[in-house]
């Protein structure tokens, strides 16, 4: 193991390294950052560390060869590598949407937009709604929920008449919480992920239109095993005229890009 890529984000630390010709990807809570570094030092005392991310300066790597890679550069290089490896390269220039604790939007190696809506909202507000702090459990609850019991839908407004717009659209996020007594924590989590997805998509779609592309690549730790969020992005493709691409290891794009960067 000669090079180790580390992406130290707001909530998670992602690690990428190659050993015996195989790439290994690991994810840890930022609270365990010091433990992770000690483990890596023991695992490969002669490796060079290629670090990126907003919390990279907190890494205690004194005495080791350390190279700091600009976060945007690492993310773009890692994404390009994964698109080729997974054979998902779009046919034209693409918008890159990185959904981590917050969300950043890139085009041609430039950050052109962003929002505080992302994984931090999912886990933070999710815990307030459900008293559950586990990301995995929150996603599982969302899978079991029915967001139409929490969200006021267009069809709820036009019950006895023809709707002028698609009746399956959201009229008001969480607009039915006080109206439907059967509304559950699972339903609220499903509604929360819908809100996050719709908000990110509206911003991303506007950014895509501004640079005249219909190709949007979604990456980031918040998409990991998060089928409900992916479904939001897939659902509106035809209606809003864009193509969504997801990467199996997109949550590690920054760590991979850092490892590969010279």
From Swiss-Prot:
GO molecular function: ATP binding; pantothenate kinase activity
Catalytic activity: (R)-pantothenate + ATP = (R)-4'-phosphopantothenate + ADP + H(+)
Catalytic site: 71
A single Gene Ontology CC term: cytosol
Record EC number: 2.7.1.33
A Pfam short name: Fumble
Subunit-structure text: Homodimer.
UniProt-recorded name of the protein: Type II pantothenate kinase
Organism name: Oceanobacillus iheyensis (strain DSM 14371 / CIP 107618 / JCM 11309 / KCTC 3954 / HTE831)
